[in-house]
Amino acid sequence: MITLINPPGTKSFSGLQMHTPNPPLGLAYIAGALKRAGLEYIVIDGTGEDLDSVHPYPGRDDFLMQGLTFEEIISKIPTDSDIIGVGCNFSTLWPLTKVLIEKVSSKFPKAKIILGGEHGTAVYQDVLKNSCVDIVVLGEAEETFLYLIRALREMSSLKDIKGIAFLESDNLIATGLSERQRNVDDIALPDWHSFPIEEYISRHQVNGVNLGRSMPLL
C-alpha cells in the first residue's frame, strides 16, 4: 500500500498564517499518477481533514499546529503501507513535517519514507542527513515516483532513476533532475477525489487558476 500524507499546517498565536492551507496540488498530481498506473494508495490530508482544529506546536509556544494531530494521522496509515510519501513545499512547514516523519518512521520502521516538494529539492542534503527521510524526489515527481515505486518493490538499483537523492552507506547520492514533461496533456489529472476539497472550498481556502506548470494566477 502507498500512503500519501499532507502534513498539518502552521499558524501563529496572532492569527498570522505561516502558509495558507490550500489544497496540496503536488500531492494531488502524484495521486493522479498512481491512479492512472493502477496502483493502490490512500491519501491523508493532515491539514484539510480538520481545518478548524489547532494544537500545541512541538517545542515552541509562539506557533500552533493546524489540522490533524500526529497521532490522528498515524492512526489513519494502513498497516500494510510499504511506501509513505510526504509533501513539503515550504521551508516554514519543514520543522513540523520533520517531527511527523520521525513519528511515522518509528511506527512504520520497514516502510520507505519519500519526501517531495520544493523544500526537499532545495536542501536534500540537510533533509537526508538530519531526518528520517529515506529518499527525496527532486523537482517534478509524477514519473519519478512511479519509477521509484517499481525499483523499491523489485529491489533494484536506485542509481538508475533520475530525479532522486538518497544515502547509501552514509554516502549521499543525487541522480540529478529528471527531464521536465513538456506536454501537459501527458500528465495525469490531479486526483482531487482523494482530498477533502469541499472542506477547503467551504472555508475559501482554494488555489488560483493554473494554466500550466507554474505558479497559479491569483
Which residue stretches match the model-derived regions?
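Short catalytic helix/loop segments, enriched in acidic residues and glycine
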Residues: 20-35
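A structure-centric signal for secondary-structure junctions around beta-strands
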Residues: 24, 161, 213-214
